[in-house]
């Protein structure tokens, strides 16, 4: 438990930031899930469109330190390679 007033304020700030980050992380995961569902259904056009929406969401999350930038880039790369395999 925080004892000083500054520690109590820091706890409140952390709670607010956690809520914002949780929302952004959920939004990011939802966009990735849309791409994965399109890939699973075999619909290449839908997957490409979904990836066009998911990539900026992932990069925004990386920019805001919700996920590491390398993790975001790796996720985009793996999704793109899976979409490329749909065409074969």
From Swiss-Prot:
One cellular-component annotation, GO: small ribosomal subunit
Family annotation (InterPro entries): Ribosomal_bS20 (IPR002583), Ribosomal_bS20_sf (IPR036510)
Pfam families according to UniProt: Ribosomal_S20p
GO MF assignments: small ribosomal subunit rRNA binding; structural constituent of ribosome
Gene Ontology biological-process entries: translation
Gene3D superfamilies: Ribosomal protein S20
Keywords: Ribonucleoprotein, Ribosomal protein, RNA-binding, rRNA-binding
Chain segments carrying region Disordered: 1-33
SUPFAM superfamilies, sorted: Ribosomal protein S20
UniProt cross-references to HAMAP family, sorted A to Z: Ribosomal_bS20 (MF_00500)
PANTHER family cross-referenced by the UniProt entry: 30S RIBOSOMAL PROTEIN S20, SMALL RIBOSOMAL SUBUNIT PROTEIN BS20C
Function: Binds directly to 16S ribosomal RNA.
Entry's family note: Belongs to the bacterial ribosomal protein bS20 family.
Protein name in the entry: Small ribosomal subunit protein bS20
Native species: Rhodopseudomonas palustris (strain BisB5)
Source lineage: Bacteria, Pseudomonadati, Pseudomonadota, Alphaproteobacteria, Hyphomicrobiales
């Amino acid at each position: 438990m925080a004892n000083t007033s500054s520690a109590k304020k820091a706890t409140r700030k952390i709670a607010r930031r956690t809520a914002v980050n949780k929302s952004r992380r959920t939004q990011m995961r939802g966009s990735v899930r849309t791409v994965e569902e399109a890939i699973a259904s075999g619909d290449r056009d839908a997957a490409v469109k979904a990836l066009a929406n998911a990539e900026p969401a992932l990069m925004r999350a990386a920019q805001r330190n919700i996920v590491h930038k390398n993790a975001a880039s790796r996720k985009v790369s793996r999704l793109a390679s899976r979409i490329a395999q749909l065409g074969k």
